[in-house]
């Protein structure tokens, strides 16, 4: 993480991506976020006010029964705590290679998030 902290601090936009495992973000994604604690002080956070985006994939067809909505709420709570700006969230059902490409509406949402992300970066 020592190599990543300066990159996180200098980033204009932080995009998190995770599969949904056991009804929330993957353990690896959550561990990555948990380690941001090292960037906190009693007065402030080095990530306060950053722009964030989230991309999720889950196996079920429903964001509620898959736990995708739990992952989204975790992300929203994190951004609220950091006083961050949510640039966008893209989520959808995808279990196998190529599943996303078969969903034009999901591809369009991902494309639009990319445009928003590009606009958020000075």
Regions found by a protein language model. Give the residues of each.
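Helix-loop-strand module that forms the ligand-binding subsite of alpha/beta enzymes
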Residues: 1-80
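Glycine-rich phosphate/pyrophosphate-binding loop and the adjoining helix
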Residues: 75-122
């Amino acid at each position: 993480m020592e190599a990543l902290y300066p990159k996180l601090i200098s980033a204009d936009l932080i995009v998190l991506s995770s599969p949904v495992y056991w009804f929330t973000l993957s353990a690896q994604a959550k561990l990555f976020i948990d380690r941001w604690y090292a960037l906190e002080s009693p007065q402030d956070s080095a990530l306060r006010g950053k722009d964030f985006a989230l991309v999720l994939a889950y196996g079920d067809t429903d964001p509620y029964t898959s736990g995708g909505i739990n992952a989204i709420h975790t992300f929203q709570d994190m951004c609220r705590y950091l006083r961050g700006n949510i640039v966008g969230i893209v989520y959808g059902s995808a279990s196998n290679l190529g599943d996303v490409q078969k969903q034009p509406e999901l591809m369009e949402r991902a494309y639009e998030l990319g445009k928003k992300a590009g606009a958020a970066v000075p």
